[in-house]
Amino acid sequence: MVQNHQTVLAVDMPQTGGSKYLDDDGKNKRTGSVWTASAHIITAVIGSGVLSLAWATAQLGWLAGPVVMLLFSAVTYFTSSLLAACYRSGDPISGKRNYTYMDAVRSNLGGVKVTLCGIVQYLNIFGVAIGYTIASAISMMAIKRSNCFHKSGGKDPCHMNSNPYMIAFGLVQILFSQIPDFDQLWWLSILAAVMSFTYSSAGLALGIAQVVVNGKVKGSLTGISIGAVTETQKIWRTFQALGDIAFAYSYSIILIEIQDTVKSPPSEEKTMKKATLVSVSVTTMFYMLCGCMGYAAFGDLSPGNLLTGFGFYNPYWLLDIANAAIVIHLIGAYQVYCQPLFAFIEKQASIQFPDSEFIAKDIKIPIPGFKPLRLNVFRLIWRTVFVIITTVISMLLPFFNDVVGLLGALGFWPLTVYFPVEMYIAQKKIPRWSTRWVCLQVFSLGCLVVSIAAAAGSIAGVLLDLKSYKPFRSEY
């Protein structure tokens, strides 16, 4: 079916450049640049993960904390560059495009690995949606509580239930989920990227202010001391910290989809490598600053979520602005992550039921003074059901730190390391047991060990949380 489509295109237009309005694959001209791709990546990367980095640094200490962050950033940049080379099969300029991560795996590896990749990728996206729902509710409650504390002068404990805030976030996502394509999200990505800088800067400023108030830099070279936690807890927490940092860098699962929005020439691979370098450098700088400043301010007592753990010090309005920025950012980030999953399910449905009006037909809703709104019934129902499911699970499992660590651990090795390395080896035809092949395999194996350790630490954390937990009764 795809081959027939390409033959028709070859008759209609030159294969090299497409036309004025269409690209070489017959789709509308792509308009993305280094900057829009960087905005998409920054939106996906500087998510709620940044807020757990002070806690992660506290587990690892002044020595290992920054080193681990730098190592993860180097790994992410390296594997993202390998992945960017797999956007086109064959020739990097005119080869067949792979529109999604799964398409790239199908072209380069094939077989059971495609199914495996799909399961891991889409489960990870599903998990990220849950993580972002929890994080947004925590930030909304932080605004409410800080105002409650301010009014009562700290006399009222201001306890509240997280469920209404998760439901509110879910309702907003149902609305935004009706945006049909990833291409149309550029404005939401840029807004979300600006918001991520806003709250990261606020966290950084509050960390610096707290260090000034303390009159010293807290923390130690080896992290949280035995005594404050048991030896076993120290090990589990160190592993969980690795998962938290891995989650803070996880965006490989949507890299190919972002690359598919980029115009050429220059080749999409070159643009994407530049965008990856820009965004990974910017995020690493922010991560180092936020993680280290949070640890310097709080030492062993660094909170799991930096902005909500600041207590409710003045200036309370700055905390409110920062938490509002987190919520706006997470609304955008949720969409940037979930759109590839939405597109995959809708594509599969149209392949399975090509003659179904329910799946294919758009309803035009007239809006006075504007173009009519095109609404697809299947899209409306399935995306709404997806958001409802993620919201309900978030209400069942509101453990921010442990969920973040587990997601990072489960997604990091297969999606950020294993598949990019294997695809690169297949595409460049690197011979088995050559020095290059052995180095890549050792690199992949090392990352697998880190992932297993991080997953174990996070599972231990979830089991600990479950001991004192009542479903749908999360009080903060």
Curated annotation (Swiss-Prot):
Annotated localization: Cell membrane; Nucleus membrane; Endomembrane system
Keyword Ubl conjugation assigned: no
Effect of gene knockout: No visible phenotype.
Main location as per UniProt: membrane
GO molecular function: amino acid transmembrane transporter activity; symporter activity
Identification of the protein by name: Amino acid permease 3
InterPro entries: AA_transpt_TM
Positions on the Cytoplasmic side per record topology: 1-33, 79-122, 299-300, 346-384, 427-441
Extracellular side: 55-57, 144-166, 209-277, 322-324, 463-476
Reported function: Amino acid-proton symporter. Stereospecific transporter with a broad specificity for GABA, tryptophan and both neutral and basic amino acids. High affinity transport of cationic amino acids.
Family: Belongs to the amino acid/polyamine transporter 2 family. Amino acid/auxin permease (AAAP) (TC 2.A.18.2) subfamily.
Species of origin: Arabidopsis thaliana (Mouse-ear cress)
Regulation of its function: Inhibited by carbonylcyanide m-chlorophenylhydrazone and 2,4-dinitrophenol.
Any GO BP: basic amino acid transport
